[in-house]
Amino acid sequence: MRGRRSIVPVSHPLLPRASAVVERALHDTHYLDGALDSLRSAVRDPGAEGRALASMAGDDVEGVVVFGLFGGTSGAGRLHFVAVEHRARRSGVARALVSAAIAALGESRARFVLAELPDDPRALDGSRAFLEALGFHEESRVDDFYRDGIALAFMRRELSPE
C-alpha cells in the first residue's frame, strides 16, 4: 500500500477508476456486467438501496464495495459485491471496505446483511472463506442457479442492535 488508506464514497469523477478496478478484478468471470451495473446505479442514484465506497491509497483506487438495503424490507442489508485490485489483495482492503459498508448499514438500522454469493470457486476463489472470516454463514442456497454446478449461496451476518 502506498500512503495512507481512506474509504470514500464513489463519486461521478471517481467512477471510471472504480469501474476499471471492477473490470480488472472480474474480467474473466460471468459476474462482471452485473457488478458494473450495480456500481453505476449506486453512483448515478445513491440511496438506501445502493451506495458505493472506494478504498483509496493516495490517488489510487485499491478496491470498491457496493451495498444497500433491500427495497421494501425493514432492516435487511445487502452486500452487492466487493472487488480489489490484484496488487492490493491480502492487505486488508476488502475487510476495510466490507467493514465500512456494514457500519453504514448498521447506521441505516439494518438488522442483518445478506451477500448473494455465486458459489463459483474457480471464478471467485476465496470469496466464501473471506465472508465466513467476517462472520457470515450460509443461510440457504439455490443449486444450479447461475449454470449447472454453480449455486447461489445466501451468506448472512447478523448485526448487533445499538
Regions found by a protein language model. Give the residues of each.
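Acetyl-CoA-dependent GNAT
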Residues: 3-5, 9-87, 95-99, 104, ...
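Short, P/G- and charge-enriched loop/turn segments at secondary-structure junctions
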Residues: 40-42, 140-143
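Short hydrophobic/aromatic beta-strand or adjacent loop that forms the aromatic wall/cage
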Residues: 50, 150-154
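Glycine-rich phosphate-binding loop
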Residues: 92
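Conserved active-site alpha-helix within GNAT-family acetyltransferase domains
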Residues: 95, 119-141, 148
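Conserved GNAT acetyl-CoA-binding A-motif
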Residues: 105-120
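Short low-complexity, flexible loop/linker segments enriched in glycine and/or proline
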Residues: 129, 153-156
